[in-house]
Amino acid sequence: MEELPATALGIKLNDGIILAAERRLSYGGFVLSRSAKKVFKIGRFGIAGAGIMGDIQTLTRLMNVEIKYYEMYNNKPISVKAAAKLLSVILYQYKWTPFISELLFGGVDDEGPKLFVLDPIGSLIEDNYAAVGSGARVAIGVLESEYDPSMNLDKGKEIVLKALKAAIERDVTSGDGIDILTIKRDNTSSEDFIKIF
């Protein structure tokens, strides 16, 4: 499969998770937008992705509804793993006409922070850090050399920025700013945008 345009990455730390992605939307080397948000908060969870923007947005909306339905029907919060598995099942249902996206899904529950990687047909892998999209090969090199699960969230943001900036330098389909979603162990979250020139 051809690499999907964009770069998104996530890291799991003892204090929470960080999801991030750059903002350039491009197809076939043509820049369509410099302000495409690829990191979304869904209740207590976060999702980031690379690929077809409409597919990522559709999956985000579907997950928002499915999570609310699950929690209302079962009268309890859904775990990160169960929510990720639900996303995996949705992706697998469309295996013959797949959503063209690679996704990172994460959050914090009673078991602590969790990060999952999903491909277009629903393969589900739990990991400590991951990068997806056309700039993933560059970004993962930075994450592998600098990742430490015990680092604090501020240091984690620095590493995420360093990895995405490295990917932006080498990948023409990535650029124009970075969105960062941080979900802390107490389930509070923050969203930041860093403009890159």
From Swiss-Prot:
**Classification via InterPro entries:** Ntn_hydrolases_N (IPR029055), Pept_T1A_Psome_bsu_arc (IPR019983), Pept_T1A_subB (IPR000243), Proteasome_bsu_CS (IPR016050), Proteasome_sua/b (IPR001353), Proteasome_suB-type (IPR023333)
Quote the cellular component terms of the Gene Ontology held in the record.
cytoplasm; proteasome core complex, beta-subunit complex
State the activity regulation.
Answer: The formation of the proteasomal ATPase PAN-20S proteasome complex, via the docking of the C-termini of PAN into the intersubunit pockets in the alpha-rings, triggers opening of the gate for substrate entry. Interconversion between the open-gate and close-gate conformations leads to a dynamic regulation of the 20S proteasome proteolysis activity.
Localization (cell): Cytoplasm
Q: Name one GO molecular function term.
A: threonine-type endopeptidase activity
Q: Keywords for this entry?
A: Autocatalytic cleavage, Cytoplasm, Hydrolase, Protease, Proteasome, Threonine protease, Zymogen
Keyword Protease found? yes
GO BP terms: namely: proteasomal protein catabolic process
Can the keyword Cytoplasm be found in this entry's annotation? yes
What EC number(s) are associated with this protein in UniProt?
Answer: 3.4.25.1
User: What task does this protein carry out?
Assistant: Component of the proteasome core, a large protease complex with broad specificity involved in protein degradation.
Give the family, as the similarity comment puts it: Belongs to the peptidase T1B family.
Subunit field text: The 20S proteasome core is composed of 14 alpha and 14 beta subunits that assemble into four stacked heptameric rings, resulting in a barrel-shaped structure. The two inner rings, each composed of seven catalytic beta subunits, are sandwiched by two outer rings, each composed of seven alpha subunits. The catalytic chamber with the active sites is on the inside of the barrel. Has a gated structure, the ends of the cylinder being occluded by the N-termini of the alpha-subunits. Is capped at one or both ends by the proteasome regulatory ATPase, PAN.
Name of the protein described by the UniProt record = Proteasome subunit beta 1
